[in-house]
Amino acid sequence: MIIIDKNSYTVFSGGEVHLKALPCFTKKVGAYKIICKDYSMNGFFALAQAVEVIKRNHSKYHITVIYPYLPYARQDRVFDPTSPFSLKTFTKLLSSLFVTKVYVWDAHSDVGPGLINNCTNIPQHEIFAQCQVRSADLYISPDAGAYKKISKLPVASEVIALGTKIRNLTGNIIDTKIYGPTVEGKHCLIV
C-alpha cells in the first residue's frame, strides 16, 4: 500500500513536486493500492508520479487509487458561462492516469464518480456501518443534499436537525440556519 500525503514528496523552489522513492516500487507485486490523502494538486501530481513509476517498472500491474475525499467534488456545476467546471477538469486529469480502479468515499454528488473512468463511490451509509461511531444526542444534516443521505443511515430514526445555507446570486453563502432541536450542550454528529 502506498500513502500519498504531504510527507510523500518534496517541492522544489520553482514549485515542482518530486515523489520520494518508496521501497515498494522495487518489489514485483503487480497489484498496488494507492491512498491519496493529500487533496491538493501537489498530492495529485505525486499520485501521477507514483503511477508512472509503477507502469514503467512493471509490464503487468493492477493499480487501485482511493480518494477518501474527492478533490473539487463541491465544484460540481457551473454557475455562469465564464466559470470553469473545476470538477470536470480534475476528473479528466485523474482518468488520464488509466488506473485499474478508483474508489472515492461519499462523493459530494453523483457527478464526480460519473466523470471518472472505472470509479466506484463508497456511500456514506456503508462507511458509517464500518466505523465505531459513538452514539450522539443529535445528528445534523448540514444541507438538503446530506439530508437525503442521512435517511439511509441506521440513525435515521434518531433526532435529526437540518441545516440550510442561504446563498446570494453568485453562489456565496451569506447565512446559515439550523432547524430542529437546539444543539447547545449536546453531543452532535454532522453527517
What do the PLM-derived regions correspond to, one by one?
Residues M1-V191:
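PRPP-associated nucleotide enzymes
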